[in-house]
Amino acid sequence: MKRALLKLSGEALAGEKKTGFDEPTVTAVAHQVKEIVDSGVQAGIVIGGGNFWRGRTSETIDRTKADQIGMLATVMNCIYVSEIFRSIGMETEIYTPFQCAAFTELFSKDKALAALKAGKVVFFAGGIGHPYFSTDMGTVLRAVEIEADMILSARAVDGVYDADPKLHKDAKKYDTIPIKEVVEQQLGVMDLAAAVLCMENKMPMTIFGLNEENSIINTVKGKSNGTVITV
């Protein structure tokens, strides 16, 4: 694998606290990413905002404003995680699809690719910059734009199941599943627009549990205990 787009769940980064950050978890992620970058893999990262804000659960705030708050939550997450990465000697860049000059660079495919090729970890914050599109869509879009080999989606749940494992103890986890089946069975892995973009661009994805030891490294090596979504 030459280039990967790592999607980190904001909720997973919060650990058992459910909100904010669990610094040992974030530091462990940083060390794993450093190891794969040192091995020659270029790493882009998208982080969800669920540890700060889940706008779709709000009944009082306008959807556009709720989504904008969510975009800013991802910017905060990327700034924090980027600094943890820097603290262990990694070089980073943060890109957003909107002006945020004091904190980030305006996204440019050429600049992002140059940073990746220079060995920097590149964070993509702010989704696609528009409401009504989830972080899933931002993840797939950036993966396609940077020509990633695969999306690595690190979550609180360790794969794709045929039912919610929190509600159904007999839920079955898939080792592999075609993206077409994910869409047809409405498994809730990602939103429909993101799934279609994956399918159209033949972008594979592995979904795995962030809390498993060395899960990111193992997934890059093809030894994940999660679910591989094929295209």
Residue ranges and their predicted role:
Residues 1-231:
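C-terminal catalytic "cap/lid" subdomain
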